Amino acid sequence: MTICLASTDREIQEIRDLQEVNLKDNIPLENRLSDGFLTAKYELDFLREMNDLTPAIIAKEKGVLVGYALATNRSMLTQHPLLNDLGAQINKIPFGGKLIGDYDYLVVGQLCVAKEVRGRGLAKDLYTHFRANYERHYAFAVTDVDRDNLASLTTHLKVGFQVVSVLQYGGSNWHVVVWDWRKSQK
């Protein structure tokens, strides 16, 4: 397994392909609870623009992309409806004695691991590289997890994220989770 930054157009296309398979609408209802799902659909041009600013962390096995963690800086939040809703909401949440919006933070735009490699610790490995690549520039990572996506919430909590708020927007209920990189443990 190789974990690195996404750098080619082919890798961006592979991210988009893996995303498509794992979107909520493409996962049978009976599998969503155990398998998890993705909520936001990103088009190729948006993924390219996001990757130009803050490259995604990707995992490849035998040359095939099997997982990714999208990094999204604040300038991209207004470019997508769900990210815009997230940004508008999270900036007002108290955290560490200030509002989240008062910090330099990085949004996890999406985390996805291919079904065939789940259960091998890849989400943790992706996030370890994510932190190593971005913690010098940001106080923490923040994202939201659909309240119906218990598989994703469990994964995020195991990595070190903590729930800081529960919000409703975009027609769903969300856990807002923060991984505070100012703490010394890695």
Label every PLM stretch briefly.
Residues 53-69, 85-87:
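Conserved beta-hairpin
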